[in-house]
Regions:
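Active-site microenvironments that recognize anionic phosphate/pyrophosphate groups
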Residues: 1-221, 225-228, 302-304, 318-322, ...
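Catalytic or ion-translocation cores adjacent to nucleophile or general acid/base/metal-coordination motifs
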Residues: 234, 243-266, 272-326, 330-333
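Helical scaffold of the NTase/Pol beta-like nucleotidyltransferase catalytic core
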Residues: 192-194, 224-251
């Protein structure tokens, strides 16, 4: 039986402050009930060992006794249920967060981030599997990550999810109703998930963390209502309200149009965190001035995408100028630069905005986006083109815009295979899974001599170079003299 593992889990919960000593009997009985056990044999002492090992032992026991199905989704649903038993109620979490916030906003977020890891909502051991590195490019050190922390569903679980009754509750994975939700085969369990209410622009929003943590303290700021993404004047006000309350965090919004937006357009939300991206480090390459806003520092950023940076001590001035730029961009057409505000009544122009505090001033980066498609570029003219799809095909959302490539899990094995083939001189086209990389590999062989010692490092740098190209493709005004001239034409039109 798994009594020792239950005792170890109780010991973990006590050490991390999830429960107190007076909760022990209640918590052990709740765990026994979940494990379908009717009695308790006290192992006397808890062993201190990794949470992943404790949960694995409990899952193996539950599967062996047919308490759960032995597939990845069922296991995730069940270990979340176990951790949910040990997770304090929302009222306790909110009270503790607010108490710490009164002393220091950073102390509050430090505590909440650690808490979300201790509850296993953020699975540290899975996040640790992600492959991460930086790559030097003309635009600075770009961050590259191959995301391995999102669980991949096995075929049995996919089939079971299709057969399960369909429900629209919660409406999406960002809705506040996820807090405490037991989950189902096609929706993750969230019993150990907690959110903190905040007010921005006099609206009820919530702060939580991403369970997949693409960067340090990767937080999500979500609307209390299931309402679609929208970039407007109120968006700029909300972003600046957030950094006013949490000045150590940046926050940004995905764009509100398909192709250039993120993966979730149905629920209004922002993403932020305690991290400095390459785009934030990028300097202003040309100072510009907007009429009637001479008090606002403005410039074009040295970045592969088209970025206007605004700085001012008065946040309301930034809101007003950002709104003017947005309105101008929404209606802007420059046929010579292949920029069209709309075609056949479909709008194409929008903005990806990012806000931060820097040296006591408010700062807004406005990234100009356009989602027009053509026969030659059916996925988007300002989207990674076909020749880069072997590395990155997905939308270029907020995180990528700022200089962090979130690459698919398939690349872990594929890049290992490419490295082996380059060292041995194997034909990549003979391997179905690696053939997509063959043209790229041919180019690399011209530039480098690959050995067993250097292949991995060289490939990592070359993946970074591909990501820089991805961002160049997504940039509306290119980093060429002609591109900068067309960029200035837009600036002068504002």
């Amino acid at each position: 039986m798994c009594y020792q593992a239950i005792e170890d889990l109780l010991g973990y919960a006590l050490r991390t402050g999830l429960i107190e000593e007076c909760d022990r009997t209640w918590a052990s009985n709740a765990l026994l009930q979940a494990m379908k056990l009717e009695s308790w044999e006290d192992p006397q002492t808890a062993r201190e060992r990794p949470l992943e090992d404790i949960l694995r032992e409990l899952l193996e026991d539950a599967a062996a006794r047919s308490v759960i199905q032995n597939d990845a989704v069922s296991r995730d649903l069940f270990d979340t249920e176990l951790m949910g038993i040990l997770t304090p109620r929302p009222s306790q979490v909110i009270s503790e967060f607010r108490r710490r916030y009164q002393a220091d906003p950073k102390e509050a977020t430090d505590w909440f981030y650690r808490f979300c890891q201790d509850t296993d909502y953020i699975r540290r051991y899975r996040v640790a599997r992600d492959r991460k590195w930086t790559a030097a490019t003309p635009y600075g050190e770009l961050d590259i990550t191959i995301n391995l922390s999102k669980p991949e569903k096995d075929p049995k679980a996919i089939a079971a999810a299709k057969a399960a009754p369909q429900t629209s509750y919660p409406k999406c994975q960002l809705c506040r109703e996820n807090e405490g939700y037991a989950g189902r085969l096609n929706h993750p369990a969230r019993q150990n998930h907690r959110i903190v209410p905040i007010t921005i622009n006099q609206e009820d929003w919530f702060l939580q963390y991403s369970p997949y943590v693409y960067y340090n303290e990767h937080c999500i700021v979500l609307n209390g209502h299931h309402t679609p993404m929208k970039i407007d004047k109120a968006t700029f006000r909300k972003l600046l309200d957030f950094v006013k309350q949490f000045p150590h965090y940046f926050v940004g919004s995905n764009a509100d149009l398909p192709i250039v937006g993120g993966s979730i357009l149905s629920h209004d939300h922002f993403q932020g965190g305690h991290y400095t991206f390459a785009m934030e480090k990028a300097p202003v390459e040309r100072t510009i001035t907007f009429r009637d806003f001479e008090d606002v520092e403005a410039g074009i950023v040295k970045w592969p995408m088209s970025v206007i940076r605004l700085r001012c001590e008065d946040d309301q001035r930034l809101v007003e100028l950002a709104d003017r730029i947005l309105a101008a961009w929404r209606g802007y057409t420059d046929k010579a630069a292949f920029v069209f505000a709309e075609t056949d009544g479909e709008p194409h122009n929008t903005i990806t905005p990012i806000a931060r505090m820097r040296e006591g001033q408010f700062e807004l980066d406005l990234v100009l986006r356009n989602n027009i498609t053509t026969e030659e570029y059916p996925l988007g003219v300002y989207h990674p083109h076909q020749e880069l799809h072997h590395i990155k095909k997905e939308n270029i959302g907020l995180i990528e815009v700022m200089g962090l490539a979130v690459l698919p899990a398939r690349l872990k094995d594929e890049l290992n295979g490419v490295a082996r083939a380059l060292v041995r001189g194997d034909d990549l086209r003979a391997d179905e899974t690696l053939a997509k990389h063959a043209d790229w590999a041919e180019e690399l062989k011209i530039r480098h001599v690959f050995t067993a010692e250097n292949a991995e490092d060289l490939l990592r740098q070359e993946v970074g170079a591909v990501f820089a190209q991805v961002l160049e493709h997504a940039g509306v005004f290119k980093c060429t003299p002609e591109g900068r001239e067309t960029f200035l034409r837009f600036v002068q039109s504002v």
